[in-house]
């Protein structure tokens, strides 16, 4: 059985959604549902696959407004209306750290969000079956999203011009990446970029909020009073989340539901730290930074530090049980300016780093542990640990770090 078919069958059993590929043709359409004018553009006029109107005929999406060719979209779920067949979480329930420790294992990955004085963890074992969580943290309305096919965990502010949007899973994909939809305008949004690509809000971009993937044991140590997305959401039985639907996916050589040519500079399924600052981006392949451990660089004029560690952090895309997923590590990125001074970092043993200017020792999460700057924290920059093919598909012209940093490893 191929990895793709295995993935499809497992996912069907997990979320009752049979994946079926349907490529769409190019052009725009009129989504008002009326058929009173001979001049009205129909799906047939636009050359779209005849299955697409079946899937979307009840939508109020304005197909005439778009920033992409509709030929780039794939219908991923075979239902008359595929929206939210993969159910988003709209009223998230949380466990305490102590409660979550009863069912999470130390090395499994979580999305870590620290905002408005609160810290929350969203285990990937849950996000693989929901992909979208509409949440409120402090006074901020956010959407925490995860696309398993791209391993992209991205959090956005979902308030736009005074209106709070509520997001769901459209059932469509582009470059294998989740396409979200909002229920207020029925616009379609690219998960990996936060841009509305079709509909009333086409061209609008959501604000990124840093939310790295880290190991559960590290979240627990950093935020003992944090909250953890519960297994008991009233949607699926809690034990369902023990079985992961994407077993073997990131060991394959090609992405699933990807229509195009992958960039062969790196293996398609290699993870990269994807840094985004002020509209600029740069990728740092795990195969490179896992050797250097600390990279001093600059993106969009901002001096940054990219670090690699927690090597045993499990992949949620490797086996059916995240407890046995192979270790892939995590990559994180921070601004490296503290108190107006740009620091230069070297790796110092496992998950520790030292700056040359003050010889302060820092941990993997940007906390100064020992030395003159003890107690200081580095400011995170927006970064994800997505798969190379996805980064390259959306950022073909962006630079890629290839090594030869000024960093050295001290005692590593």
Please identify what each model-predicted range represents.
Residues 28-412:
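Mid-to-C-terminal functional-domain signal that highlights helix-capping/loop sites
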Residues 19-22:
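C-terminal motif of bacterial Sec signal peptides marking the signal peptidase cleavage site
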Residues 2-11:
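Bacterial N-terminal signal peptides that target proteins for export
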Residues 25:
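Short, conserved catalytic or interaction motifs in soluble domains
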């Amino acid at each position: 059985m191929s990895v793709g078919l295995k993935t499809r069958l497992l996912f069907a059993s997990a979320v009752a959604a049979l994946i079926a590929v349907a490529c769409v043709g190019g052009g725009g359409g009129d989504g008002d549902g009326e058929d009173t004018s001979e001049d009205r553009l129909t799906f047939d006029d636009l050359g779209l696959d005849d299955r697409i109107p079946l899937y979307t005929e009840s939508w109020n999406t304005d197909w005439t407004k778009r920033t992409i060719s509709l030929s780039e979209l794939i219908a991923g779920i075979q239902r008359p209306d595929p929206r939210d067949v993969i159910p988003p979480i709209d009223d998230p329930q949380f466990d305490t750290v102590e409660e979550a420790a009863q069912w999470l294992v130390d090395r499994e990955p979580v999305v870590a969000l620290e905002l408005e004085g609160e810290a929350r963890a969203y285990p990937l074992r849950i996000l693989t079956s929901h992909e979208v969580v509409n949440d409120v943290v402090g006074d901020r309305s956010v959407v925490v999203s995860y696309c398993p096919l791209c391993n992209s965990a991205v959090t956005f502010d979902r308030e736009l011009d005074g209106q709070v949007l509520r997001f769901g899973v459209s059932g469509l994909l582009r470059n294998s990446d989740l396409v979200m939809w909002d229920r207020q305008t029925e616009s379609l949004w690219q998960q990996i970029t936060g841009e509305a690509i079709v509909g009333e809000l086409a061209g609008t971009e959501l604000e990124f909020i840093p939310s790295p993937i880290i190991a559960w044991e590290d979240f627990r140590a950093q935020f003992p009073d944090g909250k953890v997305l519960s297994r008991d959401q009233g949607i699926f039985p809690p034990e369902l989340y023990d079985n992961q639907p994407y077993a073997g996916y990131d060991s394959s050589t090609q992405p699933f539901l990807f229509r195009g040519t992958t960039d062969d500079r790196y293996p398609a399924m290699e993870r990269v730290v994807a840094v985004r600052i002020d509209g600029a981006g740069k990728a740092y392949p795990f195969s490179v930074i896992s050797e250097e451990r600390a990279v001093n660089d600059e993106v969009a004029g901002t001096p940054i530090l990219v670090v690699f560690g927690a090597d045993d952090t499990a992949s949620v895309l490797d086996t059916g049980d995240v407890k046995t997923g192979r270790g892939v590590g995590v990559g994180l990125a921070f601004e490296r300016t503290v108190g107006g001074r740009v620091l230069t970092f070297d790796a110092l043993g496992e998950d520790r780093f030292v700056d040359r200017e003050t010889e302060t020792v820092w941990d993997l999460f940007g906390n100064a542990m020992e030395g003159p700057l003890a107690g200081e924290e580095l400011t995170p920059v927006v970064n994800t640990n997505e798969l190379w093919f996805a980064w390259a598909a959306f950022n073909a012209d962006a630079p890629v770090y290839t090594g030869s940093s000024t960093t050295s490893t001290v005692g590593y």
